[in-house]
């Protein structure tokens, strides 16, 4: 058998359904203690049927939901600033001096991914997402594509978690 180890300790390897084109870096999200979780390109994911998804709602409802979360939005000139990580996922949504984390925003609006884009269109806020899941660790869609091309489980794990795969006795 095999185990994933980092600095002598077994790690609980995260996984998710479908990336936004690449996986997220553990270091960017959680700091040095997650340095073992690397960002890698997942080139086949953009071809997935559910890669792009769109959700829309009335602008008043959208901003009302943000305000209920403590994000103060100026009514006359609402401006949201999105901060992204290197894989394109939203880390933070800021309106003036208040903000909400990207994952919390994802939960609030019931989005499939925190890789999202906002666009106001005729009284509606349109939220377009890429991928499904948190984007950390093993991308199930890409791993499945690699397996269908003949990659072994060990090769797939080594791709997503380089240097962590250890053979057990």
Which residue ranges define each predicted feature?
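Conserved, single-site charged/polar hotspot
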Residues: 1-169
């Amino acid at each position: 058998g095999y185990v994933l180890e980092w600095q002598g300790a077994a790690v609980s390897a995260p996984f998710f359904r479908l990336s936004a084109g690449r996986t997220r870096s553990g270091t960017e999200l959680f700091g040095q203690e997650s340095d073992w979780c690397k960002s890698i390109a997942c080139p086949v994911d953009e071809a997935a049927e559910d890669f792009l998804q769109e959700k829309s709602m009335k602008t008043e409802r959208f901003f009302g939901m943000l305000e209920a979360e403590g994000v103060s939005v100026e009514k006359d000139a609402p401006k949201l600033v999105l901060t992204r990580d290197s894989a394109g996922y939203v880390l933070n949504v800021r309106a003036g001096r208040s903000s909400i984390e990207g994952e919390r925003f994802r939960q609030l609006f019931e989005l499939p991914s925190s890789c999202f884009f906002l666009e106001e269109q005729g009284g509606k806020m349109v939220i377009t997402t890429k991928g499904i899941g948190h984007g950390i660790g093993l991308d199930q869609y890409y791993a499945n594509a690699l397996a269908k091309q003949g990659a072994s489980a060990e090769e797939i794990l080594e791709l997503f978690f380089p240097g962590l795969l250890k053979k057990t006795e």
